[in-house]
Regions:
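Detector for methionine-enriched segments
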Residues: 1, 23, 45, 49, ...
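Extended alpha-helical segments
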Residues: 1-30
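Context-gated lysine
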Residues: 7, 11, 24, 57-58, ...
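Extended alpha-helical scaffolding regions
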Residues: 28-124
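Charge-dense, extended regions
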Residues: 108-176
Length: 176
């Protein structure tokens, strides 16, 4: 169905210079998919088709981390001054305006790429849209420790935000 839409768009365009090549490409993709000839796509479309597939466990981890940070940032934004002070006192500098800074762009690129795709392409976790998402330092291990602690709290957050004590518990696990 998508290939038929693409064919119609190519035919309707005023500029037909590349139409023949584009139609050939659409037909190739369509025939490869319909015929089960997936091997043909990387042969013909070098650079577009590749062997990389995101690890589903890493996708799940990134979703859990983004979900956790959504709760942290949203709750903190609604805390009173006294509650914010309580978090900062309980955690130290990590408790002062806690924000998700992403993943290390040099060593955690798959995690960063998954996060960017979720936010920018799929429109998920829109609170992070427009952010760099490159922490410039290793972050996965810290986020995973926090997410592990958060999972026990998460199931009780139906219809309510995190409390200062819950946030302190999660943020403290960043250093554990």
């Amino acid at each position: 169905m998508l290939s038929e839409i693409l064919k119609n768009q190519i035919k309707e365009r005023a500029d037909q210079r590349d139409a023949e090549y584009e139609m050939k490409t659409v037909n190739l993709v369509q025939e490869a998919i319909y015929g089960g000839h997936f091997w043909a796509l990387p042969w013909e479309m070098t650079g577009v088709m590749h062997d990389h597939v995101d690890d589903p466990k890493k996708v799940r981890a990134v979703v859990d981390i983004l979900d956790m940070w959504t709760f942290i940032e949203r709750a903190y934004a609604r805390f009173s001054s006294a509650e914010k002070a309580e978090v900062e006192t309980g955690v130290g500098i990590l408790g002062k305006n806690p924000k998700f800074h992403g993943f290390d762009g040099n060593n955690e690129t798959e995690y960063m790429g998954i996060a960017r795709f979720l936010v920018e392409q799929l429109g998920r976790f829109q609170d992070f849209k427009g952010r760099d998402l490159n922490s410039h330092s290793p972050a996965v291990a810290r986020h995973m420790r926090m997410a592990s602690r958060f999972q026990n709290i998460r199931r009780n957050l139906i219809g309510r935000e995190m409390s200062p004590s819950e946030m302190i518990s999660v943020l403290k696990s960043e250093r554990d």
